[in-house]
């Protein structure tokens, strides 16, 4: 409880510092700390509204801060059950910002079939490719390869999904009791 009260007080101080700050470098970091604080407080709607009003189109911030803010934005959207929006952002992070690729992969959550279809309809071609890559890593690498091939037959990322498919096959063979024998 004391930590929550401290964080609420801190969020007020951070917001005041953000609003009064003129230096883009510091302002971006205040915004990041605000997003992080509201996320941990469970104030997801506040974080989403703040991001959309204050952070979304701020190209003066460093690339790292822009993507990290976007990651917390996606996390808050997910907590608000806006799964398609969150997963689309995670696909962008996975594709476009290598330092957070693992975070995007871990945070991405495949959807029910109907939601997945709607998500693909919202996505542009590049986002669709990223979505199928994530789908292949999570669920069915061969389906991921098939769909990425339809979008871009020269895409080299399909090799990763092929390795994933081989890993799954190896695991299934090694852990199959038919292949064990008693000495």
Tell where the protein language model's regions lie, with residue ranges.
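Helix-turn-helix repeat elements of alpha-solenoid scaffolds
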Residues: 2-13, 39-53, 82, 108-109, ...
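Residues within HEAT/ARM-like alpha-solenoid scaffolds
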Residues: 2-5, 9, 25-29, 65-68, ...
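A conserved hydrophobic secondary-structure block that centers on an alpha-helix together
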Residues: 10-61, 67
């Amino acid at each position: 409880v004391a930590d929550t009260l401290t964080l609420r007080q801190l969020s007020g101080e951070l917001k005041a510092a953000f609003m009064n700050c003129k230096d883009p470098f510091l302002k971006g970091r205040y915004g990041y700390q605000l997003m992080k604080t509201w996320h941990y407080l469970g104030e997801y709607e506040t974080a989403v509204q703040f991001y959309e009003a204050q952070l979304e189109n701020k190209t003066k911030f460093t690339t790292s801060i822009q993507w990290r803010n976007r990651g917390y934005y996606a996390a808050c959207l997910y907590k608000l059950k806006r799964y398609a929006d969150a997963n689309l952002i995670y696909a962008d992070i996975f594709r476009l910002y290598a330092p957070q690729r693992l975070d995007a992969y871990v945070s991405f959550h495949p959807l029910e079939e109907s939601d997945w279809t709607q998500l693909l309809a919202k996505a542009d071609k590049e986002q669709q490719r990223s979505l199928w890559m994530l789908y292949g890593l999570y669920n069915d690498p061969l389906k991921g390869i098939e769909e990425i091939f339809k979008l871009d037959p020269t895409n080299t990322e399909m090799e990763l999904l092929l390795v994933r498919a081989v890993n799954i096959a190896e695991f299934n063979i090694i852990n199959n009791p038919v292949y064990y024998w008693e000495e």
